[in-house]
Structures are given as C-alpha cells and as structure tokens.
A protein has these predicted regions:
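Non-heme di-metal
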Residues: 1-333
C-alpha cells in the first residue's frame, strides 16, 4: 500500500487489502478468546449507547466544506492522524510481574504476550515502523486525497497540546502496584478510544467518500477502510486481555491483599468510560467553534456559519447522570 508516495504497511492479495502482522496475531487472539469461552468467562465490552458520535458529524463537516470553510475539517483529520501517531507510546507501557501480582497462572493468555509482541505490533500499526508508514501516514493521505492537499495549519499540534498541565492522578487502587494500575488505565483508555473510533471511521468514509465534497472519493474512503480493518485486532486483543484479568484475582503490593479482578476492571472501565464519553465531545465542540472563527475572517459570516453548524449538531448527550452507575456490558466469549 503506497499513500502520498510513502510505502505503508499492509498490502494486497488478489486485489483485496490485507492488514499487517496478522498471520500469527489474529489466530492467537481467536485461541485466547476460545479459552475464555471454554472457561465460561465473559468478554467486557462498551454498550453502544455510551459511544458518542464523531464531532463534527457528517452533516456538519459537509456543510463546512460546501461553504468553502475547509480548515476546521482539515484540522479535525489532522488531529486524528496526530493521535494515531501517539499510539506508538503503547510500546512504553511497563507490564507488571504477573507471577507475583496475579494469583492464577497467565500461561497461554493474551496477558502473557503483551510485552513480547502485542504492544509492539500495536505501536507499529499506529505510527509506522522504520521506512513503513502506519495509520498516522494513512490518515494524512486520506485527508490529502479527499480535501485536495489542503494547507495544514502549523498550530494544530500546539493547540492540541495546550490544554493545560494534566492533573496529578489519584490512585484508584493503591493496594495494587503502580505498574499494574498504570497498565490497566492505559489499556482501558486505548480500548475505549479504539471502540469510539468505529464511528470516526464511518464518518470519514462517508465524508471523504462523498463525491460532492471529496476530490478523490474512492481513494480517500478506501484508505480509511484499510485503517478500520487494521484496528480490529487492537480492539480484540485488548478486550481479551482485560477480560482475562477480570477473571482472575489480583495481589496487592504487600503480597497478602487480594482484589477481585472483576471489581478492579469494572471500576476502572466505568470511570474512564464516563470521563472520555463526556469530556471529549465537549472539547471537540469547543474546538470546532474556535476553528470556524479562525478560518473565517469576516466576523459576521463566521457567526452565521457557526450558528448553522450548531443547528446540525445531533444533540447527543451521555445517557447517565454523574451519580448513576454505568452498565458494564458483558457478552459471551
């Protein structure tokens, strides 16, 4: 697969796109999932009602493009590419000592393979490896094909990173090692992001595949479809690994305290899901409004475009109050 004159991962067999690093990874994930099924352990998953729609939505983004206000859409697609590049950080996750921090054996599980290949394969998929491009470069190519090589604002990364210093994280389960809790938080966050991304893929394929607003609809939509296929094993292995840990007993740093894996995983999952499904959409709304006013120099027209843009908002809100406990949907492995 070559995009923007960059050799990317993956390729074609008889004209069909084949994702990279799947010959061993995909059957291994199926086997680990089957072991959960045989043991009658469920898979944790995110209920669809908790998944916020992409912002801006298709109608909003198409409206901007038809109005000639391309920059906000360019920014949105560029941010996706940048965030994909950040995915390389998953290789830096420090995996705890499962032999001393989990009561039951993890032999023959996805957990046992996180540090020996799964995290590294995930990182290479997202950010590329050596001279091969990954999803970062593929998103950039889809953007450039669909929007006809738009001018990229030079402040996208700066504005993305200027949200202020992150608050000091309060330990959720201080009984556990810092490494165990940090790994769980990272894996949960990435799984939530990857699950939310399914709506982003559908949005991008529809928008960039729309001949009314896309310069190269077939090529742009195809690249996004390739990325979507590549992401499937990410969701699958993270789901399986977290479900494996959920079915086990975690041992505290004192070597004596034990915690139910289900209690810990469900607690982390509920907390992170609520935060990401409420904060991220609001941030996207605020950023989109600011982007419109940056892109349109005429203040009166900018206000008019922004109002019409808001009228096309789907109005989605998170379905639970802050004091309500979230459902954690479990399904058969």
């Amino acid at each position: 697969l070559v995009t923007n004159e960059i050799q990317c991962h993956g390729g074609y067999v008889d004209g069909d796109y084949v994702s990279p690093r799947g010959a061993l990874r995909r059957p291994a994930i199926r086997n680990w999932r089957e072991r959960l099924s045989v043991a009658d352990h469920p898979l944790i998953t995110i209920p669809e009602k908790y998944v916020p729609p992409n912002y801006p939505n298709y109608d909003q983004a198409k409206y901007l493009l038809q109005e000639g206000v391309v920059e906000p859409v360019t920014r949105a697609l560029t941010i996706i590419a940048i965030v994909e590049g950040f995915g390389a950080r998953i290789r830096e996750v420090s995996v705890p000592n499962f032999d001393t921090e989990v009561e039951e054996s993890v032999e023959g599980t996805a957990l046992a393979h996180l540090a020996s290949g799964l995290f590294e394969a995930h990182a290479r998929d997202e950010a590329g490896h050596r001279d091969q491009g990954g999803h970062k470069q593929m998103w950039e190519a889809a953007r450039d094909a669909g929007l006809d090589n738009p001018e990229i604002p030079d402040d996208v990364l700066l504005r993305l990173m200027s949200g202020g210093s992150p608050a000091t994280r309060k330990r959720l389960y201080p009984e556990l090692s810092e490494r165990m809790e940090s790994m769980l938080l990272m894996m949960t966050n990435v799984l939530i992001i990857e699950t939310f991304a399914e709506d982003t893929f559908n949005w991008a394929k529809k928008l960039l595949g729309d001949p009314e607003v896309s310069a190269e609809p077939e090529q742009a939509a195809h690249i996004v479809d390739c990325i979507a296929r590549d992401e499937v094993p990410h969701v699958d292995y993270l789901t399986v690994a977290l479900s494996e840990l959920r079915a086990r007993t975690l041992i505290g740093v004192d070597g004596k305290t034990t915690l139910s894996g289900a209690e810990v995983i469900d607690g982390v999952f509920r907390r992170q899901l609520r935060g990401m499904a409420t904060v991220r959409p609001q941030q996207s709304r605020e950023r989109s409004q600011a982007d419109i006013h940056l892109a349109v120099s005429d203040k009166r027209r900018a206000s008019s475009v922004a109002r019409q843009f808001e009228e096309l908002d789907s109005g989605w809100t998170f379905p639970h109050r802050d004091d309500e406990e979230l459902d954690v949907l479990l399904k058969s492995a």
